[in-house]
Regions:
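Acidic-enriched and Gly/Ser
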Residues: 1-189
Length: 190
């Protein structure tokens, strides 16, 4: 048996599992963890529990620490910087006359990288935009093209049932939608 803790980084995002070591991490607490993208700030969604070896992808990255008030302030500052980065990127997209829709800006916790998520109908040559953004923000810039379902998950909205969209509130992964399913729900087939 291995002890793991489930951590989520964004609203309705996927839950990732980490080694809690000997930390006491209640549900809803904030933690600092080591990820493939670097050090990240997340929320405990599954408190520490034991699982069998084959249920977890090895090796488990560790939880570095429970977040401190300083970490919480850093995370809040990053959210404010993301709003400003979003506005700046929108202006640069218009300046370069690119046919893309910016969805979200995201700083890594340690400010080593700034990610921009966007949607577009086809492939976009955004090399000049990346150079422009790198000169403004003086950090590594990454642009990621996402699909319309991912866009909806990030932005949210209200479904035809009148409730908040499932993908924005609790679905962490998307199952394929068949033509039959769309017809049963009277959705357009495009």
């Amino acid at each position: 048996m291995i002890k793991v803790v489930g951590v989520r980084f964004r609203t309705a995002g996927k839950i990732y599992y980490f080694d809690p070591k000997d930390l006491e991490l209640p549900l809803g607490s904030h933690v600092i963890v080591e990820t493939a993208r670097g050090v990240e700030y997340g929320t405990v969604m599954v408190p520490p529990k034991g699982v069998t070896d084959d249920e977890v992808v090895q090796p488990l990255k560790p939880v570095l620490r429970a977040s401190t008030p300083e970490d919480d302030k850093t995370e809040q500052k990053n959210r404010e910087k993301e709003r400003q980065a979003y506005k700046t990127c929108q202006e640069k997209i218009q300046k370069h006359k690119l046919n893309m829709k910016l969805v979200e800006a995201e700083y890594t916790f340690d400010n080593n990288k700034l990610l921009f998520y966007f949607t577009a109908d086809g492939r976009i040559d955004f090399r000049e935009l990346v150079k422009d953004l790198a000169s403004v923000f003086r950090t590594r810039i990454e642009l990621r093209q996402i699909g319309v379902r991912d866009e909806t998950k990030i932005l949210g909205g209200v479904g035809i049932c009148g409730r908040e969209l499932c993908c924005h509130t609790f679905l962490s992964e998307f199952a394929p939608v068949s033509i039959k399913m769309a017809k049963e729900q009277n959705l357009s087939l495009n």
